[in-house]
């Protein structure tokens, strides 16, 4: 089980990313716009740099929904490999069976 502080930190980052997503997209579009003047593009770069670090989606980390484990994460299920195996063996995940051949 991951520390509760780490799990809460990730949740806080997700909220921050969602809060600034539109503003970041607008600034990045201005920077990428070749028709904008150099001054406008430079101002947009400065504004983008002034945003909080945790507003960048690159800083997000996928974590297991049950334990908070950061490694061995399956996006389709939102669980780490350990908890996914446990839930599949209990029959809680429909349509998934243990492989045998």
UniProtKB/Swiss-Prot annotation:
Domain of life: Bacteria
GO process annotations (BP): translation
UniProt cross-references to Pfam families, sorted A to Z: Ribosomal_S14
InterPro entries: Ribosomal_uS14, Ribosomal_uS14_bac/plastid, Ribosomal_uS14_CS
Transmembrane segments: none
Disulphide bonds in the chain: none
GO molecular function, one term: structural constituent of ribosome
Keyword annotations: Ribonucleoprotein, Ribosomal protein, RNA-binding, rRNA-binding
A single cellular component GO annotation: cytoplasm
Cited function: Binds 16S rRNA, required for the assembly of 30S particles and may also be responsible for determining the conformation of the 16S rRNA at the A site.
UniProt family annotation: Belongs to the universal ribosomal protein uS14 family.
Subunit-level organization: Part of the 30S ribosomal subunit. Contacts proteins S3 and S10.
Protein name, as recorded: Small ribosomal subunit protein uS14
Source organism of this protein record: Acinetobacter baumannii (strain SDF)
Gene name, Swiss-Prot/TrEMBL: rpsN
């Amino acid at each position: 089980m991951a520390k509760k502080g780490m799990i809460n930190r990730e949740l806080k980052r997700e909220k921050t990313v969602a809060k600034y997503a539109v503003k970041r997209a607008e600034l990045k579009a201005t920077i990428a716009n070749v028709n904008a003047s150099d001054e406008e593009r430079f101002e947009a770069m400065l504004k983008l740099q002034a945003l909080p670090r945790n507003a960048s989606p690159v800083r997000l980390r996928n974590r297991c929904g049950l334990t908070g484990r950061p490694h061995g994460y399956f996006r389709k299920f939102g669980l780490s490999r350990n908890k996914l195996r446990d839930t599949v063996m209990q029959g809680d995940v429909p349509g998934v069976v243990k492989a045998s051949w």
